[in-house]
Amino acid sequence: MRKFLLTVCCLGMFGSAFGQSKLDLKSLMELNKLRNTSIPTYNARTRSLEQPKTIPTNIMAMVELKDQNNRADLEAQGIKVLRVRDNIAIALIPLADVERIANLKCVRRMQLPRRLYQKMNLVRKEVGVDKIHQGTDLPQAYTGKGVVTAVVDGGVDPNHINFFKEDGTSRFAYVGKIVENKRNNNGYQYDKYYPRTVLDTMTQANNAHALETFKTDDDESVHGTHTLGIMAGGYKGNITYGEAVGTYQAKSVTGANPFYGSATESELIASCGDLNDSYIALGIDDAIEYAKTSGPSPKPCVINLSLGSNIGVHDSTSVMNKYLSKQGKEAIICVAAGNEGEKPIALKKTFATAGETVKTFLTPTDISPVDEGGTTYYNFRNGQIAAYSKDSTVFEFYINVVDIKQDNRTILSIAVPNNLNGRDVTYASKAKYVNNSNDVNKDFAKAFEGYVSVSSAIDSETNRYYAFAEVMTGDNQTTNQDEDYKLTLEIKSKKAGQSVEVYTDDQNIYFDDNDEDGFVKGSTNGSISDMACATNIITVGSYNVRNRIASLDGSIYNFNGLSTGESFPIGEISSFSSFGTLGDGRNLPHVCAPGAAVISSVNTYAVKNKDLDYEDDQLQGKLKKGKDTYYWHQSIGTSMATPVVAGGVALWLEANPSLTVKDVLRIIQQTARKDNFVTSTGDPVQWGAGKFDAYEGLKQVLKEKQTNGINGVRTTESKDAPIITKAGDRTFNLFLASAKQLNVRVFTPSGQLVHSLSAQGNEYNLNASSWNKGVYLIQVNGNKAQRIIIY
């Protein structure tokens, strides 16, 4: 199941506090939210608004320095620097001092935390992992030995049996938990949990605890346990699971667990807790550092990020995306494309003339009521909107209140202020939503409960003009009970040929024409997560491999309830899979993998949480072992597809630890399958290179390693020497990189020719099943013969 989390940031900036700021508009609005406890914030888990209780002393921020040597300048200001990667630092900033630090000469830009959202048996067979585990036509089997596999996620249960070795000990190196803690002077709490055998050997153990005592970071989420299980879960013992016995019925059977993952013998790391980009970057850094320093030589590392946010410029230039790009040079990082592929949350327009407009309705995604104290919000609109010009040319940007019964007449227009410094304009229904009571507007209150805020600036990195809006409204149930008043977005060009890109975060808003003339729908091209637009990462979309779920209650379900019809057609692109054509010309995702539906291990503490109401109809596997019970459950999303790729890549890294992200991406694109579904369903951009093929990719890795060696050291005499590898009991793979045709001759040691053949291409599978036992010499295209032995 997909779970979409919502957020809301407060508005109403302190007008006198900001000059030309190096903080982006989202950070400015987030700063005001952190400083104000009167404005309710949205809790997506409970679908209710809550009142903040405390103001943090410090906040973790990402600071882009003008030079990597500026760390000392930052520390001279009393700032605690936690990490530096090239010229980007993760630092603790006093909340009262954010603007001053941002405007230091040594600082280029600063970004405050952005909340990110969590976005197998059939799967292993589909992508060829079963063949890899069995060593089919390979020199050996691969299971991820010697590779570090990590997730940054929430809902992690590291003591699930899926993450134990056969001897019952943990495969985890450590689990890191980072959470906001306003009572802590740092503003956060970072604890690490190690297996007790490791903890007992540590001389310094500040904030270090025994892994065996860890339960979970979040008993309302199964997400992180599920994604890690897909990537690297290794339990293969018996469990009880649902098995179909007809169209509608299932039975419970006991047998070998069919739902284990790909990198079953890899070393595990999880970073969990609160999911904002500063914490996520810190968790990634620590996983990379562990992989580099925990052994006699650096270990290859794969990191799965089934997280994202749609708000942002959708290129590689944000501080977070630049930091992620730098991290991608030291680990293979796989990022989910997003689950908004069906949502029109992007809008792109090139204006033919100056003064031309584009208008769209801001439509709520979910119309069910949301409560806070004594206030109920109906037709709840909650989210952020960002609009970007192609260059520094400004455009007019309005959030309008219109009356649909009066031919969409605008009764109130909220326009960006005539400044470029981030100072906002806010309209609110009540004083509790704002710092300045002058922002309360009776016409706005007639239509809505809540507030709208808009601002604009020039992006200091790209020199692009952009406008930003925060929206949190519910329909006034006295004067807008009939829903006659609506919110719209309007953009007006300043010159012919001007282009704009507009994105909303899809937390509770999408762009729609409302079947009204003069308004436009949004586009699904552009639904890609902003974080997935970084360079030096692998971005993953989803396709369907399972649409009927055999559950432990004896029934078979699809995603419309009991299995009575087709949903998520097998082999086709998952309709929810996000995608986008970026302004820099890139199409994302890079590739798709099975994401609907995938069965994997889930957080025991979430299943046992009575508020979540997990029953056997939602569970596909169960194991009771002593006093503990472990569970397996289906879920869908690019969150599930991404660890399929990450786990497959871990197997490649076992075969060749020297692979870079460029190598991995190239091999993914070369070996991806392009079947009829890829060419006939979904948007071509949505598919990327096609369907991820771990098996064919591994074969390519082995070929390139044998041909080119590791770090440039060749394992054969020349690039044109043939590569002969054992592919089975009496089969051999012959490969000659430069050949268009293979001419193969087989001799006895005495020089007698016993076999000869020709084959088109540079690869051939030689079947020697009928040959007598003995030693043979194989010559390919006249090269030096190589010896094989038939047993």
Regions found by a protein language model. Give the residues of each.
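Autoinhibitory N-terminal propeptides
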Residues: 4-6, 17-139, 148
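Substrate-binding/access-modulating region of protease and related hydrolase catalytic domains
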Residues: 273-351, 369, 374, 379-395, ...
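N-terminal domain-start motif of subtilase-like serine proteases
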Residues: 28-55, 97, 118-168, 205-222, ...
